[in-house]
Amino acid sequence: MTEAQRHQILLEMLAQLGFVTVEKVVERLGISPATARRDINKLDESGKLKKVRNGAEAITQQRPRWTPMNLHQAQNHDEKVRIAKAASQLVNPGESVVINCGSTAFLLGREMCGKPVQIITNYLPLANYLIDQEHDSVIIMGGQYNKSQSITLSPQGSENSLYAGHWMFTSGKGLTAEGLYKTDMLTAMAEQKMLSVVGKLVVLVDSSKIGERAGMLFSRADQIDMLITGKNANPEILQQLEAQGVSIMRV
């Protein structure tokens, strides 16, 4: 029996029982305890089950991670589409834009694809899409591949400063009167290096993120040139941001 076959049977057991012990896996598959634990570890790392003491349990109500293939399933998809369309209208022919990772970033890249603009990105799903669609000018920022975010990250003191664009579009997990928050520290630090060399910083977040504070402060409010968000965004937070010079667009 191959590893793939063992994994399939193990997942079927979990679908039926909800929980299995290492002993039960050994008995059902006819393998050693060490092999059973190794299989459980691999499936846990891939997010297909949850490893627990002496066994594994099924993952319930798991929301699928979006990809360019299931982009329509992204949270607040319709609002993000409107945000991306509005953002794309800001860019003039011949300008360059920096686009980072996430569902809104991909939607923005899709809107700009085919237009006479240079797109700079470290987000591989977007880069692959642009290349596949034969977009004329794509710059892929180099670095080490980060699997969890599907991006490349350059080491400390790298040449990210060379990638200066007229516009930088980015998102985050929350936006308050203090500024934009991101939860992935490595991604945030890599992007922060570019803030001093881009022309304008535009934050793209759906209305559910307004007023939320999560992770590290990526950029202060006074560093943000424009915010594009949904019509249901907290008006009090928007007023506080406007008072600090942030231009607000609600779509």
Swiss-Prot record:
Where is the major localization of this protein? cytoplasm
Instruction: Outline the extent of the HTH deoR-type domain.
Output: 3-58
Keyword entries, A-Z: Cytoplasm, DNA-binding, Repressor, Transcription, Transcription regulation
Query: Is DNA-binding found in the keyword set?
Result: yes
InterPro entries the UniProt entry points to: Carb_Metab_HTH_regulators, DeoR-like_C, DeoR_HTH, NagB/RpiA_transferase-like, Tscrpt_reg_HTH_DeoR_CS, Tscrpt_reg_HTH_UlaR, WH-like_DNA-bd_sf, WH_DNA-bd_sf
**DNA-binding region spans which residues?**
20-39
List, alphabetically, the SUPFAM superfamilies matched: NagB/RpiA/CoA transferase-like, Winged helix' DNA-binding domain
- Pfam families xref list: DeoRC (PF00455), HTH_DeoR (PF08220)
Compartments reported by the entry: Cytoplasm
Q: Where are the transmembrane segments?
A: none
Q: Might you name a Gene Ontology BP term for this protein?
A: negative regulation of DNA-templated transcription
Please name the GO terms that the record assigns under molecular function: DNA binding; DNA-binding transcription factor activity
- Name assigned to this protein: HTH-type transcriptional regulator UlaR
- Species this protein is from: Escherichia coli O127:H6 (strain E2348/69 / EPEC)
